[in-house]
Regions:
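Alpha-helical support elements that line or immediately flank enzyme active sites
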Residues: 1-2, 127
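N-terminal glycine-rich anion-binding loops that anchor highly charged ligand groups
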Residues: 2-10, 15-25
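Short secondary-structure junctions
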Residues: 2-4, 52-57, 135-141
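General beta-strand structural signal in soluble alpha/beta enzymes
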Residues: 13, 59-60
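A conserved regulatory-domain signal marking ACT and ACT-like small-molecule sensing domains
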Residues: 22, 29-37, 42-46, 60-63, ...
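Short, catalytically relevant binding-site loops at active-site mouths
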Residues: 65-67
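C-terminal binding/interaction regions
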Residues: 70
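Short beta-strand scaffold segments in enzyme catalytic cores
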Residues: 73-77
Length: 167
């Protein structure tokens, strides 16, 4: 999610996730996902221990979301460099998720592909600059979505690619 180790994760559960989280393994699954584990990883039951060994501080609480999917979680993540990312994810069944918001802006993507998230100002040329950089690195874009708070304000590009994006 952050292209760097996550050192702190505040995980806020909502709806049925909040009601059944511990009993259904929701907390374990979310922590495993933050560690980058695939859904068939045999280490998932040990995700809390592995997160501790990786230096990840984890806390759980209750999310206050409006009009959210009943199986939602709000994640407030802090990376090793101090940058924060806030996302709301929805469990849509079959071990699949949908990201419904990024840093307070509505979104709608799965994360099934290597995903680049770019924060920028909503100004002409930013999209062209990013897509040009990807082209020069021979990275093909599978999907691209743009979200903004308002004209000229904070914006986010969500770019799902066919391969990992080189640094």
């Amino acid at each position: 999610l952050m292209a760097q180790p996550i050192v702190k994760a505040q995980i806020l559960l909502y709806g049925s996730f909040l009601a059944t989280g511990k009993g259904h393994g929701t907390q374990i699954a979310i922590v495993a996902g933050l560690l980058g584990m695939k859904t068939d990883d045999c280490r998932i039951p040990d995700s809390f221990r592995l997160a501790g060994e990786a230096g990840m501080e984890i806390s759980f609480g209750e999310a206050e979301l409006k009009d959210a999917h009943p199986n939602s979680a709000q994640l407030i993540l802090t990376g090793a460099d101090g940058r924060q990312l806030e996302i709301v994810g929805e469990s849509i069944g079959g071990s699949r998720i949908n990201i419904a918001s990024i840093d307070g802006l509505s979104a709608n993507f799965s994360g099934d592909y290597p995903t680049l998230i770019v924060h920028n100002l909503d100004q002409p040329g930013h999209v062209a600059e990013v897509t040009s950089m990807l082209s020069h690195k021979s990275v093909n874009i599978a999907t691209m979505q743009l979200y903004r708070a308002g004209r000229g304000g904070h914006a986010v590009m969500v770019i799902e690619c066919d391969q990992e994006v080189p640094k």
